[in-house]
From Swiss-Prot:
UniProt keyword list: Glycosyltransferase, Magnesium, Pyrimidine biosynthesis, Transferase
Top-level EC class as recorded in UniProt: transferase
Name of the featured protein: Orotate phosphoribosyltransferase
Organism lineage: Bacteria, Bacillati, Bacillota, Bacilli, Lactobacillales
Source organism: Streptococcus pyogenes serotype M1
Enzyme Commission number(s) of this protein: 2.4.2.10
Gene name as annotated: pyrE
Sample GO molecular function, one term: magnesium ion binding
Amino acid sequence: MTLASQIATQLLDIKAVYLKPEDPFTWASGIKSPIYTDNRVTLSYPKTRDLIENGFVETIKAHFPEVEVIAGTATAGIPHGAIIADKMTLPFAYIRSKPKDHGAGNQIEGRVLKGQKMVIIEDLISTGGSVLDAAAAASREGADVLGVVAIFTYELPKASQNFKEAGIKLITLSNYTELIAVAKLQGYITNDGLHLLKKFKEDQVNWQQ
């Protein structure tokens, strides 16, 4: 079983992911979605957490061997990033969604040197907007952002476009395609549900029609 499949299985087992193709969720953006993901739940399950953190470490070593500092996005990327940095014996920092409105007005908390090679940790990629904003902030403060590594992606076309336009490499440990395949195999969804979930990936607006 691949890492992506193992993580997808764990996310379903611990109910970090809910699939309701016949009774969709409403995202903050207003999009009706057959999937809801809360990867913060993974922190409460040592087996799942260990699988994910070890997956992060191996992925970073394989794709970004020159990394010098790990950064987590506030707030979801912070605990994962701190664990990864500890496992890799690397410095850690975190990136706020916006600068503090008091004190030194920092957007990056922790010490990042000019030109230091950074990998940013995120828990979930939908469109990628927030983590790309974090990457831009890190670059403005002098970091050399090598890429983003995340637990899971919905594989939305908008995310691919956004990362391509930003020139930022994205690697994820698991993904939507893998998850719905595992969900069908393990009986979480019906054939009709799988069909709707596949349609959502292709067209987030008209998938119910």
